[in-house]
Amino acid sequence: MSRSVLAEGVKPREVWAWAMYDFANSAYTTTVVTAIFNAYFVAVVAGGAAWATLAWTTTQAIASIAIMLTAASVGAWADRHGNKKKLLAITTVGCVAATALLYWVGPGDVVLAMCLVAIASFFFGSGENIIAAFLPELAGDEDLGKVSGWGWSWGYLGGMSCLGLCLAWIVAAKGRGEGAESFVPAAMLITAVFFAVA
């Protein structure tokens, strides 16, 4: 990242740390929301019921509404106390913990799955709002798009990296004769650890 696009006094390593958050948290949306757990929820947790997809989308809608209703007050609190990093840590721990707890979701655990995914998605979305609030502090006005795009690209790389790890685990588990109720929960632990340490 060229220093010329950064705000005055900002070091490249600060932008690197900011972008690496996208690298880490994209593991959640890629494996839980988009590619693995959503299919597991519909086919295994809900047993392929006709209402399963509606239940999944309702869960995401509830989380989105909760984010919408709380974003302004959370942002105001962060601005008033000047402690965005603490809030970001809280949202990260919340999403990681709820994702890890998906390990315990098996066939028939519809309510548990919906609650955990709603919590994880709420913390993820709230964290996205907070991390975005750092951008004007990192880049000059004319270069916000460049720095944002750089972080976005790292997010894609992180999401695909975690998905690759999970799929490698799933292929190996299938080779051992394991079913989805075994290898998908383990993939959720992989996702949680990836988000926590990446």
Briefly describe each language-model feature range:
Residues 49-57, 167-193:
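A membrane-interface helix-boundary motif in multi-pass transporters
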Residues 53-77, 97-98, 160-163:
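Central cavity-lining transmembrane alpha-helices of secondary-active solute carriers
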Residues 60, 92-99, 155, 194-198:
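MFS 12-TM fold signature
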Residues 68, 89-109:
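C-terminal ends and interior cores of transmembrane alpha-helices
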Residues 78-94:
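Cytoplasmic membrane-interface "Motif A"-like loop-to-helix N-cap segments
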Residues 145-170:
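Glycine-rich segments within core transmembrane alpha-helices of 12-TM secondary carriers
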